[in-house]
From Swiss-Prot:
One of its GO terms (molecular function) is structural constituent of ribosome. This is Large ribosomal subunit protein bL9. Binds to the 23S rRNA. The gene is rplI. It comes from the Bacteria. NCBIfam families: L9 (TIGR00158). It comes from Vibrio campbellii (strain ATCC BAA-1116).
Amino acid sequence: MQVILLDKIGNLGGLGDTVNVKSGYARNFLIPQGKAVMATKGNVEMFEARRAELEAKVAEQLAAAEARAEKVNALEAVVLASKAGDEGKLFGSIGTRDIAEAITAAGVEVAKSEVRLPEGALRNTGEFEISVQLHSEVFATINLQVVAAE
């Protein structure tokens, strides 16, 4: 199925690209989220008419994400207290939701879907570098200190 992308999508293309994707991906993800429209003749003409407006919107989103990234990078360290055993092993784990709430409490709004934990949830106390993906092109890192709660 051919679609016109209305946003930059990793491993697929950028704004205005006409790409072939599987029909389920287009119908269930790209089109409902407003990231693409079907590549019909009418939609191609509509896209060309709105191209400048869409490019301005994408540039605005990128600038907002870069501003948020500067705020996240400006944070010294985020401290998260959790119950832990004697050897520093946590009772339970710290996931993306907990980290996002801690960063938000520190003063920068971050959604849990933006927090990247490639090794999975944190299960030990210590210092960790956490990556936050604020936009498809904008990443920020933050130092997270996990300490044992009293």
